[in-house]
Amino acid sequence: MSLSRLLIKDFRNIENADLALSPGFNFLVGANGSGKTSVLEAIYTLGHGRAFRSLQPGRVIRHEQEAFVLHGRLQGEERETSIGLTKDKQGDSKVRIDGTDGHKIAELAHLMPMQLITPEGFTLLNGGPKYRRAFLDWGCFHNEAGFFTAWSNLKRLLKQRNAALRQVSRYEQLRPWDKELIPLAEQISTWRAEYSSAIAQDMADTCQQFLPEFSLTFSFQRGWEKETDYADVLERSFERDRMLTYTAHGPHKADFRIRADGAPVEDTLSRGQLKLLMCALRLAQGEFLTRESGRRCLYLIDDFASELDDARRGLLASRLKATQSQVFVSAISAEHVIDMSDENSKMFTVEKGKITD
C-alpha cells in the first residue's frame, strides 16, 4: 500500500496540513527548522504510534495544544484503507481504522511497513545491541504472525522475573516464571536466527553494491551460550541474577554483529561509509519483505544529501526507484533531489510549518 493522502493537525510546528501524495517519490524541501522533518516524523508516528526524535508525546504536540491528530489514506491494488491516530500529552492514544476505534498501534505498523534513514540512524551500527535487535525484530514482526504476541509476553515475563529476583532466596521460587519464559525465549531466538539467515544473502549483495571495497560478514548472537539449553542457563545463573536483580542472559541480550574485513564496522568505516551501509541494510530488508510477502515498504529519508557524494546519492536513488516503493525524501535544496524527480513525483516546499506543492 502507498499513502495517498496525509492530514496533519497540531504536530510539531505544523498547525494544519492536507497533502495529496505520489505513490512514487515525494520531496520535502526547506531550510533547517522549517518543518520538513516533522512531515517525515508525522508519517513515522502514524505507523508506529511514536515519533523518532522524541518519546515524550508532549514534545511533538504543537505549543499550547492538547493533542495531535494524524490521518492517512492507504491505497492498495484492490482496496483503500483509512487510518488515524490521536495522542494527547498524557500519552493516551486512539487508533482508528476504516472508521472504527479501538484498534492497536501494532495494526498500524502492519499496514504501513516502513524504513527510516536519518542522520541519527548510525545507532544501528555503532549503538548498543538494542538497535540491532530492533532491526531483526522488525523483520520477524512482518514475517511471523505470532511474533508480536510472543515478544510482548516475553517483555512482561522478564519484568516480572526481575521483580521476583529481589524477593526470592531459592531458584525453585522462580520456576513458575521460567516455565513460561523458556519456550518463549527459544521461539523468539529461533525466529530471529531464521530471519537473519534468510536475509543474509540479500544484505551481502546490496552491501557489495554500495561498499565493494569491503568484505562484510553478519552474525546473530542469541543472548546465551551456543549449544546450551536456556533452562540450564537460567538455573545456573540464579545467584548472579539475584545479586544483579535482573536476568543477565536471554533473547533480550541478543545482538546482530556486522564486520568489515574482520573488524567491527564502527571501528573501520567512515561516517559516509556507515551511512551507505545503513542505507544498504534498510534497502535489503525492504526488498526482502517485498519478495517474501508481496508488500512494499515506505521509505523515509531525512537530510538526503548529508554524508553522501553525488555518485553515492545517485546509486541510492536508482536502487530506491527499482523497489517501486513510495519514498519520502527531505532536503535543504531542490538541487540535491532534482535528479531523482520524474513525471510521477511530487515536490513540496516547507516553510515555518506551512507546506505547499
From Swiss-Prot:
Keywords: ATP-binding, Cytoplasm, DNA damage, DNA repair, DNA replication, DNA-binding, Nucleotide-binding, SOS response
Keyword DNA repair part of the UniProt annotation: yes
GO cellular component term of the entry, any: cytoplasm
Superkingdom in the source lineage: Bacteria
Location in or out of the cell: Cytoplasm
Primary localisation category: cytoplasm
InterPro entries referenced in this protein's UniProt entry, alphabetically: DNA-binding_RecF (IPR001238), DNA-binding_RecF_CS (IPR018078), P-loop_NTPase (IPR027417), RecF/RecN/SMC_N (IPR003395), RecF_2 (IPR042174)
A GO molecular-function annotation: ATP binding
Transferase listed as a keyword: no
Biological processes, Gene Ontology terms: DNA replication; DNA synthesis involved in DNA repair; double-strand break repair; SOS response
Residues reported to bind ATP: G30, A31, N32, G33, S34, G35, K36, T37
Extent of the signal sequence: none
HAMAP family: RecF
Family assignment from sequence similarity: Belongs to the RecF family.
PANTHER family cross-referenced by the UniProt entry: DNA REPLICATION AND REPAIR PROTEIN RECF
NCBIfam families: recf
Biological role: The RecF protein is involved in DNA metabolism; it is required for DNA replication and normal SOS inducibility. RecF binds preferentially to single-stranded, linear DNA. It also seems to bind ATP.
Name under which the protein is recorded: DNA replication and repair protein RecF
Organism this protein belongs to: Salmonella typhi
